[in-house]
């Protein structure tokens, strides 16, 4: 499956001349911001999407297909397709699959999405308030925890949301290009127990088209931070 923001979901058809085919009909989303396939529960999710029977994008709406299929999105008593709308925040920014839940970040909150079964399908629990998340890709998952960069601090989630103490906080956010939050990208270097964040600083050499030029690293085993520059 392929996710095209503000468009439908596409599937790959290897034996057709046009191999990218939009999924239509059966209540399939006509617009969405993010897509996630749960490898544990076998559902396809879209985040920030249109309600069933509508075409307008709701930035706080979550929908899921019927289990074990990506083509059936019409909520019926005979299938497991459904939807829910988050109440806190103004838009869904990031999502991440963890071991037992799907974590959903809005611009101000963190939700835990868990499978309830039966007619309820999935339910969302608020697990973090008054937070921020820098970008869609600013979250990494490692060692049973989610780590992410916010707009002025770092956070972790291990069943509860906490501010992550960082002795480089002033260094990072005091020289941060705040117009380029969307470029923040997180990665997990599991071999060395590290979470990396790449970001654009105010002193980036490329002024007209800034690109990530610095990184900050958190070693979650030794609980230490380090940083560096990226040569471009």
Describe the function of each predicted region.
Residues 27-66:
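Solenoidal tandem-repeat scaffolds enriched in leucines and small polar residues
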Residues 58-69, 212-222:
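Beta-propeller blade signature
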Residues 7-8, 13-37:
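Asp-box/WD-like beta-propeller blade repeats and closely related beta-sheet repeat scaffolds
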Residues 18-26, 79-85, 123-129:
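A short beta-strand motif characteristic of beta-propeller blades
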Residues 43, 51, 87-232:
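Beta-sheet-dominated scaffold domains
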Residues 65-78, 111-123:
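Per-blade loop-tip surfaces of WD-repeat and WD-like beta-propellers in eukaryotic adaptors/scaffolds
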């Amino acid at each position: 499956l392929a996710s095209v923001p503000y468009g439908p979901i596409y599937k790959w058809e290897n034996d057709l001349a046009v191999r990218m085919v939009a999924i239509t009909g059966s209540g399939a989303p006509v617009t969405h911001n993010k897509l996630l396939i749960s490898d544990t529960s076998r559902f396809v999710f879209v985040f920030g999407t249109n309600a069933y029977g509508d075409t307008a994008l709701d930035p706080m709406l979550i929908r899921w297909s019927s289990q074990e299929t990506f083509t059936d999105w019409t909520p019926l008593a005979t299938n497991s397709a459904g939807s829910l709308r988050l109440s806190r925040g103004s838009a869904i920014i990031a999502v991440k699959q963890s071991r037992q839940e799907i974590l959903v970040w809005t611009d101000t909150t963190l939700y835990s999405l868990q499978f309830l079964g039966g007619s309820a399908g999935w339910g969302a629990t608020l697990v973090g308030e008054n937070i921020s998340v820098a970008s869609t890709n600013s979250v990494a998952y490692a060692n049973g925890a989610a780590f992410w960069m916010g707009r002025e601090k770092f956070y972790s989630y291990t069943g509860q949301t906490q501010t992550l103490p960082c002795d480089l906080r002033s260094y990072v956010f005091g020289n941060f290009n705040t117009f380029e939050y969307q470029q923040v990208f997180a990665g997990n270097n599991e071999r060395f127990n590290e979470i990396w964040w790449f970001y654009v600083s105010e002193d980036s050499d490329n002024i007209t088209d800034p690109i990530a030029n610095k990184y900050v690293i958190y070693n979650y085993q030794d609980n230490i931070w380090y940083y560096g520059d990226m040569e471009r």
